[in-house]
Design a protein with these regions (language model features):
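Glycine-rich phosphate/pyrophosphate-binding beta-alpha loops
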Residues: 4-7, 49-50, 209
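C-terminal helix-coil-helix/basic helical segment that borders enzyme active sites and/or dimer interfaces
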Residues: 114, 123, 137-196
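Short, intrinsically disordered, charge-balanced linker/junction segments flanking boundaries
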Residues: 2-3, 195-209
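A short core secondary-structure module
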Residues: 4-44
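Active-site lining segments that contact anionic ligands and/or coordinate catalytic metals
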Residues: 29, 55, 75, 160-162, ...
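Glycine-rich beta->alpha junctions and the first turn(s) of the following alpha-helix
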Residues: 41-141, 207
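Short, well-ordered loop/turn and helix-capping segments at boundaries between secondary-structure elements
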Residues: 18-22, 35, 39, 61, ...
Length: 209
């Protein structure tokens, strides 16, 4: 089975399958790509703490795939998979999306009040906001370094891993600050007449964990 596939958006899937049983550990693995409509594929939704099923569990029962669906050379799928994951890690870190979230956070903190003062005027919350702005800027420049290296044909290496981890952590911290800035209303999620932004901040807080 394959856990956490986005079948909601995908009609193709790739799999790493062992095609040479006697080959060494990372050898004898082939990289296949084929349709999600292939007979024998079953998709089961995985409901998360958000209450939604953004990811799915995919099961394969006697699935048969034509040999021409192999990507690259037979038995060399491990190298193809590493290249795929390298690009995926770089794509998962999106500083522009985080900057948009920060702008929305600033607007929220200017509107929400803690006691008689705006949330953005609270020194502790403001310090957290400034720290997040600095972290997102650093992540953006790290992304530029990765792009520059890629254009020169150099591998991203550990820098891509840093971007992926940093992106997830910063997204969660931004949502956490928004919830704290809302005060007691920050615990409200869906189906509440007083929820803010449709419960998006709470949803993101749980999704980015």
């Amino acid at each position: 089975s394959d856990v956490c596939s986005s079948d909601l958006h995908a009609d193709m899937i790739f799999c790493l399958v062992r095609t040479e049983a006697d080959a060494p550990k990372h050898g004898g693995i082939s990289y296949l790509i084929f349709s999600m409509n292939t007979p024998g594929i079953e998709v089961r939704p995985l409901k998360t703490m958000t209450g939604h099923a953004e990811f799915n569990e995919t099961f394969f029962t006697e699935v048969r795939v034509p040999v021409d669906q192999i990507v690259g050379q037979r038995g060399q799928g491990w190298f193809v998979a590493n290249a795929t994951l390298g690009h995926e890690r770089g794509m998962l870190g999106d500083p522009d999306a985080l900057e948009n979230r920060l702008q929305a956070l600033v607007a929220l903190m200017q509107e929400e009040r803690i006691g008689q003062a705006r949330a953005i005027d609270d020194p502790v919350l403001r310090d957290r906001l400034v720290a997040l702005q600095a972290e997102v800027a650093a992540m953006k420049y790290n992304g530029m370094r990765i792009l520059s290296n890629s254009l020169k044909g150099e591998p991203g290496g550990i820098a891509k891993l840093i971007v992926k981890l940093q992106s997830c952590e910063l997204a969660h911290q931004i949502s956490a600050l928004a919830i704290d800035a809302m005060g007691e209303l920050g615990i409200l999620y869906h189906h509440s007449p007083r929820e803010r932004d449709g419960g998006a901040w709470q949803w993101n807080y749980m999704f980015d964990l």
